Amino acid sequence: ADIYGQGIRPQPPAAGKEAGKYKADRTLLRARANAALDVLARDTRTDASKLAATGYCFGGTAAIELARSGAKVLGVVSFHGGLDSPTPADGKNIKAKVLALHGADDPFVAAKDIAAFKAEMKDHYVDWKFVSYPGAVHSFTHKAAGNDNSKGAAYNADADRDSWYQMEQFLKRLF
């Protein structure tokens, strides 16, 4: 999905600032994600009864927000995405199954946000799974992130392989 809009393709560090606009305005983020979903659902080559959303980093945040919006998707997968919500009561809207794949040592996702996410899922009886990878930090699927965990973002081959496997199994169960 093109959350940012036509012609906007920010690169780090500008990408973080641009994503921050949408993290600060979840209504806008959800609207953009749902607009993309609507385009996909209307495509004649698409079976609109068999939709799922996956995303990495900010895209993972968007996938979870899509679920929180009550979107008609069977499931969402977030790879090292943000888990926080300014409105955890919106968990009541989630109809999708949720798979969150997280680096256990990710410095960009606070422990309180993980706890709140888990509580939100439990409190609203969401069908969910949270997988945490010990020794993995943010961007664990991105080879170009390097291998220096002290920078907060680094590739982790084991977490990358297993998270892909987890997603494959999740999607097989959905479809």
Residues of each region from the PLM?
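Alpha/beta-hydrolase fold nucleophile elbow
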Residues: 45-56
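Gly/Ala-rich beta-loop-alpha elbow adjacent to hydrolase catalytic centers
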Residues: 55-59, 63
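Short beta-strand/loop motif that positions the catalytic acidic residue
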Residues: 94, 100-102
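Acidic catalytic loop of the alpha/beta-hydrolase fold
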Residues: 105-109, 138
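Short alpha-helix in the alpha/beta-hydrolase fold that links the catalytic acid
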Residues: 110-121, 129
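C-terminal catalytic histidine-bearing segment of alpha/beta-hydrolase fold enzymes
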Residues: 122-175
